[in-house]
Design a protein with these regions (language model features):
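N-terminal secretory signal peptides that target proteins for export/translocation
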Residues: 1-19
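C-terminal motif of bacterial Sec signal peptides marking the signal peptidase cleavage site
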Residues: 32-35
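N-terminal Sec/ER secretory leader and immediately downstream segment
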Residues: 37-140
Length: 255
């Protein structure tokens, strides 16, 4: 941003400079633009990754949806790690030797569309409230994250990667964002019969504040809302383009 600001400043100076000064400024502009082009991006940015053959079959919206899905699932797995650290008794219920192995089981079940034995036939929204209720006896952290992950994938038509032939429903994505907000509230407020949280998460005390769980949920919701807007705009533009083609009755060249 600072680099481009300097470019714009030098460009404006050319309007008022003499011929010799304009030549000097032109040289400076070339050098500065070269520096702008060579400036590295944030290492965490997906724009630095190499293009893959699959991207030839993806529209801009498909790419946004694919990247958003990956980031959202990764955010859920980070939440799972945090929750296991604060609630170690939960991963032990799964029979796994440690939290990492317990987490791998949940991740595999989410991405391979496999059911969790302790949830029976429940998945996505049917499993959400159940995992934070008195009748659930399994790993609450794993069950909760599995429910959220399967809900996300269901809202995206059962897929995690998207291509030109795929049609995402903006309303389902919007609903998934609202479900995430409700899940965040349930996590913070659902308590057992003794008044204790089913799962320890956000904390505000005299020792300090830990709102990292709410922040992670907020990022997921923001990405889902952005995708909803992108899908709505894509559909609107398709309708406008079709109407324009009818209005102007443009014929296509045949030679």
């Amino acid at each position: 941003m600072a680099c481009m600001t300097r470019v714009l400043f030098l460009s404006s100076l050319r309007l008022f400079a003499g011929r010799g000064m304009r030549a000097c400024i032109a040289v400076l502009l070339v050098l500065l633009l070269a520096g702008c082009v060579g400036s590295p991006f944030d290492a965490s940015s997906d724009s630095e990754s190499e293009a893959t053959p699959d991207e030839l079959f993806q529209t801009h919206t498909d790419r946004v949806a694919t990247l958003g899905m990956r980031k959202n699932l990764d955010a859920l797995y980070r939440l799972m790690e945090k929750l296991y650290r604060r609630n170690p008794a939960e991963w032990r219920k799964s029979g796994a030797p440690n939290a990492q192995v317990a987490g791998q089981r949940i991740r595999w079940a989410v991405e391979q569309h496999q059911p969790l034995r302790e949830l029976g036939s429940r998945s996505d929204i049917a499993a959400l409230a159940f995992t934070l209720g008195p009748d659930y006896r399994g790993d609450r952290v794993g069950g909760f994250i599995y429910a959220l992950g399967s809900m996300l994938i269901t809202a995206h038509d059962g897929q995690t990667t998207f291509y030109m032939t795929d049609m995402l429903n903006a309303q389902y994505i919007h609903n998934a964002a609202r479900n995430m907000e409700k899940a965040s509230w349930l996590l913070a407020n659902r308590k057992d019969p003794h008044g204790r949280p089913w799962l320890l998460s956000n904390e505000m005390s005299v020792q300090g504040q830990n709102l990292s769980y709410a922040i992670e949920f907020g990022k997921i919701v923001a990405r889902l809302d952005l995708l909803t807007e992108v899908l709505d705009e894509s559909g609107r533009r398709m309708g406008v383009s079709y109407a324009q083609s009818l209005l102007f009755m443009n014929f296509l060249p045949v030679q």
